[in-house]
Amino acid sequence: MGEETDRWQRHDWWGVVLDTDDVETLTRFYAALRGWRVHHLDETDGSLDPGEGVAYLNIQHNREYVRPAWPTQSGEQQMMLHLDFEATDLYSEVVRAVDLGAELCEHQPQENVRVLLDPSGHPFCLYVS
């Protein structure tokens, strides 16, 4: 097996980009929720480094951002994606997420999953496997 290349020197990074009208709030929310380092933050975008692998989460300012509806409603802004995060203790992770600024959704389609909305209204899930 060959020598591994430092993750910062690799050219196979990939990421997810979330639009928002409040870059700082959303960047700091996900940094606190996941314990990820804020790699970059200004008024136009924020970038989070999870610390291993080659994936990242980027938060991008969009002046025309509209919060998606959850659950989905005809004629309303649809969610484009949602993030899933595994939890060790679902109850305590939900409480922590709400304390950080998330909103627990009334509609919960699965027993071992909790759907929440981040401060910009993007649905995300906490789950136990």
Question: What are the language-model segments listed below?
Answer:
Residues G2-Q9, A69-W70:
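A detector for short, charged/polar N-terminal pre-domain segments
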Residues R7-H61, E93-V95, D99, C105-V115:
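Core segments of cupin and vicinal oxygen chelate
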Residues Q9-D12, S74-M80:
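Short glycine-enriched loop/turn motifs at secondary-structure junctions
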Residues A55-Q73:
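Conserved, structured core segments of small domains
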Residues E76-Y91:
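Mid-chain, well-packed structural core segment of small domains
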Residues Q110, Y127-S129:
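Residue-level structural signal for beta-strand termini and adjacent loop
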Residues D118:
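Short, acidic, Ser/Thr-enriched surface-loop or helix-capping motifs
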